[in-house]
Each structure stands twice: as C-alpha cells, then as structure tokens.
Amino acid sequence: MTINVGINGMGRIGRMVIRAIIESQNKDIKIKHINNRSNSEASCTLIKYDSVHGKFNADLDYDDNHLIINKNKITFSQESKIEDINWNKFGVDYVFECTGKFNSKEKLVAHINNGAKKVIVSAPCKNADKTIVFGVNEDQLNKNDQIISAASCTTNCLAPVANVLHKNFEIEKGFMTTIHAFTSDQRILDNSHKDPRRARSASQSIVPTSTGASKAIGEIIPSLKGKLEGVAMRVPTPNVSLIELVFCTKKEISKDKINNAFTEVSKNQLKKVLEITSEKLVSIDFNHNSSSAIVDSSLTNVVGTNMGKISAWYDNEWGFSNRMCDIAEYVHKIS
C-alpha cells in the first residue's frame, strides 16, 4: 500500500527527501503535496540544480499551484503557519516536517489536527512520541506514535557506530568530535548570529560549536546515557562530515576486533545503514552516499587494550534524508 506524503519546507533536507524518493524509484512513497515559503518557480530551480549533489535527473516543471516531477503534478502551497496547511484536503497521510523551525510536539500537533496521521521531523524534537535512529531503535515504534523525530544527521552516524561498539565491547565512557561541513545556519560573511562563532564567515575558518548528538545517544541507547560527550568543528566544506569517537571499554579491544565487528554488521543487520571501507579516501568521495555511517577502518586505532578511536564518514544531507524515508516505510508497515 502506497504512503501518501506531504513535505513542509524545501530547504536542504526537504529537497533531498524529494530526490531520495524519486531517485530510488520508491513505489511505496508518493508525494502528494509540498508547502514552502518560496514559490513553485524558485523551488523548481533549486531542486533541479544543486551545487552539492548535481543536477536532479528528473523531468521538472511547475505552474502557480504545482511542482511537476516526471509529469506527476504535486500540489504546492506557500503557507507560513502550519495551522493553515490542510493536509486532509491534499490526501496526505504522513508529513515530512523539514523546516527545522517547529521543534516541539506542541507546535507540530497542528499537522495532526489538519489531517496528517504521522509527522516525521528532520531535527531533534522536544516531547516527540519517539526519537528514532533507523538501524538502531526503530523497533521501539508502535502504531500509536504520531510525532516522530529522526534525530540529527550526526546522531544518525554516531548511534549505529556507538551501538556496535557497546554491544561488542561495553563502552564505559567516550568523547565524540564531529568535523562537520558548514550549514545554512552559518554566515557566508561575518554577520550577526546568536552564536558568536557561527556569526563568523563559514568559508574562512574552522568554527567550534555545540552538538547535541552525544547527549541524544542516551535517548536512543539508554544504557549509554551520561557516558558520551561531544563537540562540533564546522569546516569550510559544503557537505560530508566525519565523526571521531574516542572511547574506553570494559572488554579488551584491538584494531582487528573493532574492524571485524563493523565488517560483520555492515554485511548483515546494518546493511545499507552502515558501511566500512579500507580505502584511503577523503570527504568528497562520500558525497551522495546514502549510508548513515561509513566506518574508515584505516583510521581505527587503540591505546593499550581498553581505549580506542573509531572514525566514520557521513553525507550529512543525503544519508539522513534516506533514513527519514526508511522511518516512514517502517511506521507504515507496523501501523
């Protein structure tokens, strides 16, 4: 049975969700309606031509009230308040909330009141019914969950990596650094921002800033609550990021033991969510990679028998957008 979806917000993630659905030729998800503050002409141009992911290989057109993809007319609106989007009228069952502006259940319940059955949020969300990292804790979902957070791109990389380590070696504590591509929240040139570091030119500096990914792990994997901390270093690249997790374990570890554990799960239970590579690659080589985490086995290291470091690449746009679609399909299957 097809899932009829709507998308609120055509920023970086909203556009990538659309591309993920179309490029994968996913017959289980049908886009019925898009709401975006800019008009259909501007939205059509931005999804067709992308500076990071290249030209969208689809037949794209528009009129005043539609975005037309491969001759499929998708109704289009420009409501600034979610209370004004009538999802019921457009035949939408699931909403991908991709604005990044509505980050609490109290705000998002308006989607449900307007006809949506489920809302999948592209960001951390206060009081969400569930926060899900696909490949780690989707089995916690039930048919009554309505507001579902897909966490963040960094959490989607860190969680499966930490989970594999914890199951195999029992993490006692750890510290994560994400070397993260700059995002649209930063300034191209120095300008005002509530974070004085993000106020500085994204293309000229390494910008230390906060990340909630390490603390969010405790919500995803309760046995790791309070055991991880982290920081983000924004760097002057437009896409693809890298986590480095330094950790201490109860069980003895070695480079081979760690890499073998990831090789095993990449072929089985985490296939398509987690990959492992031994090639000596750089960030651009992982652009448009749909996995949540690509462990770089050449960077795995240990000190003694109980302290280690693991590195994992992730396309912070494309991988995350694909996991949002996976969550929608999983929820639909159990509902």
Task: List each language-model region with its residue ranges.
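C-terminal active-site/capping subdomain that shapes the small-molecule cofactor and substrate pocket
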Residues: 3, 230, 242, 246-335
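Predominant activation on well-ordered alpha-helical scaffold segments within soluble catalytic domains
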Residues: 14, 18, 109, 159-166, ...
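A broad structural signal for alpha-helix termini and local helix breaks/kinks
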Residues: 99, 169, 221-222, 249, ...
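N-terminal Rossmann-like NAD(P) cofactor-binding subdomain of oxidoreductases
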Residues: 1-199, 302, 326, 334
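Generic structural signal for well-ordered, non-membrane alpha-helical segments
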Residues: 10, 14, 104, 151-154, ...
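Catalytic core of tubulin tyrosine ligase-like
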Residues: 170-232, 238
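Glycine-rich beta-alpha junction loops
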Residues: 37-39, 125, 152-154, 178-185, ...
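A generic structural signal for well-ordered coil/turn residues at beta-strand boundaries
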Residues: 63, 128, 202, 239-241, ...
